[in-house]
Amino acid sequence: RIGVMGHSLGGSAALGMGRERGDVSAVIALESPFMFDIQGVDHGEFVLTREPYPVPVLNVYSDSAWGHLSEWPQYAGNVALLSGDHPAAFNLHIDGLGHLGLTDLALSSPLLVRLADGARPARDSVEGLRLINETCLRFFDAYLKNHGKFQLPVAP
């Protein structure tokens, strides 16, 4: 069984693989729009596929995008999953981190992350990354190894 994950546009590519490839069993997208689901543009609006997302997906968001998902048209597919009834679509908001704070760049170059995200993270980067790593591992364990039922953390 194959799981794929990525951050930002890499996560968009992972989401596309989950839709296109039959050998992908689960996808984790770290603050990534469903770009592959955009079928075209009609009167200035994105036209999205109506096909349900075919595999379990965990979407992880930072403060950078969480409050703007419904405003940003490239995130229309994400909003549909947030408000839909897909039984294996999970959405996790990690408060206190910015877009690059979802990556290990926060450990190797905290100053660069602070500059790129526009502010100092309100959450400790190590704590935030530990939460992301543990959640992603439990998600893949559940959907790739059939080790229990996945549940989001209670109070991230």
Each model region followed by its residue ranges:
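Active-site signature of alpha/beta-hydrolase-fold catalytic machinery across serine-
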Residues: 16-20
